[in-house]
């Protein structure tokens, strides 16, 4: 049984004292007072300025969009950022926490379109780009005040005064510089490619934008299997009386059929020919069963002519187009051969629409389809991709002009049926990419875009990724590593309005081609082109349309007629956020030394999907520009969902307003819930709507910490004791003091290890916030439910003895250390305790340094102390569990426990007397008996793991079964299990090849374990004598009096009179025998017992009853 579970059991069974100190504690109000204290005293500012500028810890705060309110995901990220920043600050580092805002891009434009009532690029251009962008500029920070309120209330320290915005001129100039550098390195090119396209936003997306935020979701599409009629019969298939040869093609996008320009078959597929009504249908051999099933279902007679048709028989055959919109295109409407065609789905033959498929585009381009010069970009795109920005067909597709492509599917299928070309239709459920902003299904279309040639630097990115400490560690070679291995060139241009413009000017006359790329506004560097130098005009805004007005003659045109005009695209906003490490500092124009000395960042965190978003774009640009990874350590946290695993949304009404949670419970509880959960380590948090999980943190974490502080102050104030911090363990001689001090030092070290050391079990260096939180929880469990409870009598004694002072000093010392080390994880409540305990150190706990325990060395004796104490805590848990199950009151003393040692365990046999005494007192038992013959009370049951044994010694399986049945096995002194006997054939089994279960033969027995190790078995003697019963009654009376004191709100130091009325002889005898014990425990100055009592004599007393003993008890405060 683990220590924490044991202590929970002790707390539950003993009905511990904690509750008396927590009633009325308003942690939310306490937090608000602390927030005000930090603000009034500039504690955050001091926490930065008090640290050495040359000893920096750098973390990047990813810029959010400020046009919506923060959600729980933002809070989680913020809690992790703030915790690490506070921890490193207390470790002595200077941690700047500059906040940033993502201002450009689709989120801002979509909001502006909605609020302005304009939709689409043409409408925006008619409205006016200048007016539209000005609206975006003014609305993009719409919720910045609310963001600040949320962040402040979550006790997160952020520098808003020096925030950066991606729309600032300085930030945008650094983006210009980075693009110029990429251009100079040969990593930028313009090309026509098939890209994911949001027709709702009227812009292309990056390939990674289709992989974030669950962009893929199920969609039902109407599919069609249609027949393309060959113009010539395949020579190997010529048969008399065949009137037509048709190729069957399956497609999930019927709307692309009007743009069909070719068909593709595979050299690796065998094809079939089947005859229906004198027409031969050709399809892959793998499709034959589907073909036959369809024919049988619809009573269609067919004859299989051949199932071994070679692709060579079909290559370059011409076919009749289904639609005549491209009848004039040379080289079109032929059967082409391509390796990408597979037979897993469909007919093994694919229709090619080069404007709407990547493979289609590449294959047709190789074949010169269409026969248009690549340089004539506009004509090529208008031909192969005849749709407008909104996804509607243009005039070329005359039958469907101005119809959205998705709306044409049914009409196209109807036309196919009318032409007798439709073989079958189906509904097809598949995962399909959707726009991350509008939730509309994307299309893939040909567009001219500007690209970063990521494939050129992919291998270097893979190498640099090995130097990053990912948390969790599997991200390195898993989610992020695999993404890098499959990295594609990045389309960074967007044909939108509100964003940093691409600094590219092109000649408007293709006869005099020229491209100018600019890297700065003013001429700062000799080798970087500057806008003001070439255009001879001051520039104070790079946004459209002002930047578009910069036009100059083409220097390469001797006629002087052509002009240099800027390409109209703006940057993908992911390029902007990926540039924040240097752009926030206006590098290289300012802060050059600061950036170069502290790049890459020490730490970064966001949720795990950013491996395909911000983390990725940071990595691309950092590798390309600086040949370095952008960060050294990265936490990829998980996602906050509702209890059903659904995304939190207003529509589902499945989450509580975070500010209401903060108002009711405070933010520390929410912080610790998230930090201590696997969500801080990549898992998902299923958060209830009613705040139950947050309340649990109050009860299990914050209250225990507060209780320990409260316990100290109550009794220290009564005794007027000024405690001090113990600096040397040698000063401590009390066994309980020594234990809790050692446990404190061990806990601090475990937190340091979790946050800073390499952990082989999880494969990363530090930043294990969950483990650090668990250490804090476990310590305060031990402090409250073991140390303080076991030492209450020392604090309650009436005299100020040396032992009492030592107890105060010990509790004060561990609170001093633990408040410090817990401060990053519970910043507000630890600050409150720090202020109240007046440690006479720094003004704030967050200005102090983490505990320095290097000078404190735990000796072997100290380690043994911890081991023995944990052992007796476990034994206590076992005994209390038996009492609980067998309904034996804890206050009822018992005669003895017998402990049977397993394998002569020395920890049990050598348990010192002083620990035995603590154990006996705790479990309320009179004596311990140790025995070694465990077989008298328990037996082992061996179960072999045959699959594992079969891997190692498969030929011995019969022998093993025989030995097991004959019970020929034993555990050796070294802990290994031997099957067989040494004189004959025997086998030493590995740990994973068997399980050994111990079965006890008494209902009053329990196994004793420490960690994974079996130590022995204990048996509780439940025999009761009159003496034991009377002592139990005395303890019950003490409990009733204490409960009555609490119910009547007496102070813990109040003296009382007690009157007991009962006719129970056993109760009378008990009171007489245990009189001194009862009055001492309850601070009673008198205790009188009566058989009958006049109510008038106790009119001023508080009354309570003990029903199972027919006892009435009266107390009065003196």
Swiss-Prot record:
Report the EC number(s), separated by commas if there are several: 6.1.1.5
Q: Which UniProt keywords apply?
A: Aminoacyl-tRNA synthetase, ATP-binding, Cytoplasm, Ligase, Metal-binding, Nucleotide-binding, Protein biosynthesis, Zinc
Q: Does the keyword ATP-binding apply?
A: yes
Location of motif 'KMSKS' region in this chain is: 647-651
Q: Which cofactor does it need?
A: Zn(2+)
Q: Which residues bind ATP?
A: 650
The record lists the membrane-crossing segments as none
The UniProt annotation puts motif 'HIGH' region at: 64-74
Nucleotide-binding is among the record's keywords: yes
- Origin: domain of life: Bacteria
GO process annotations (BP) = isoleucyl-tRNA aminoacylation
A GO molecular-function descriptor:
tRNA binding
Q: Where in the cell is it found?
A: Cytoplasm
Its predominant location is cytoplasm
Catalysed transformations (reactions) = tRNA(Ile) + L-isoleucine + ATP = L-isoleucyl-tRNA(Ile) + AMP + diphosphate
Give the protein's biological function: Catalyzes the attachment of isoleucine to tRNA(Ile). As IleRS can inadvertently accommodate and process structurally similar amino acids such as valine, to avoid such errors it has two additional distinct tRNA(Ile)-dependent editing activities. One activity is designated as 'pretransfer' editing and involves the hydrolysis of activated Val-AMP. The other activity is designated 'posttransfer' editing and involves deacylation of mischarged Val-tRNA(Ile).
User: What family does the Swiss-Prot or TrEMBL record give for this protein?
Assistant: Belongs to the class-I aminoacyl-tRNA synthetase family. IleS type 2 subfamily.
**Subunit relationships:** Monomer.
Would you tell me the protein name for this molecule?
Isoleucine--tRNA ligase
- Organism of derivation: Ehrlichia ruminantium (strain Gardel)
The record lists the lineage as: Bacteria, Pseudomonadati, Pseudomonadota, Alphaproteobacteria, Rickettsiales
This protein's encoding gene: ileS
